[in-house]
Amino acid sequence: MKKILFLLGCMSLLSFIITPKVYAGEAFSLPDNSVVYDIDQGGSQQFEVEDDLGRPYIITIEEETQLLMMASSVKNGTYKITKERPLQWKASYKIDVSSNKITRAHSASATAITGSFKSTSLRVDSPTQATYYLKRTLLLVESSINLRAKLSNGNIVVTY
């Protein structure tokens, strides 16, 4: 009985060691501090992440519902990008996507529960990238927050 348990243990250990692992990053490389929204899956996708200092954030990407859906491309539409530091602040904006290009960034919003936002700026940096730049002040300390959405390989890559 001990031999059988030993063999089963060895076999399961080997299966973990030799099993090939496929990572999403193999298809394309991701920048640090990024999450990937699968446009084909659609809907609302939420990610609980931490920055380099271990501070928690919630990143949410939502597909806006449209009354007239165009049959030509499921990738066309409006997507809301949100970054939130729970109990401290929340920032969001929307991007319009058409023919795998960001045609417009709009509806920027920033709410501070603690501290305040000194400045905010929403820009379409290129046909495939939009960034929301924010400067936040808390107890005389200023910090920069960037929330970038980039179209890549049929996905929206959000860098926080």
Residues of each region from the PLM?
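Mature secreted bioactive peptide module from preproproteins
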Residues: 64-160
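N-terminal prepro-regions of secreted/extracellular proteins
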Residues: 1-84
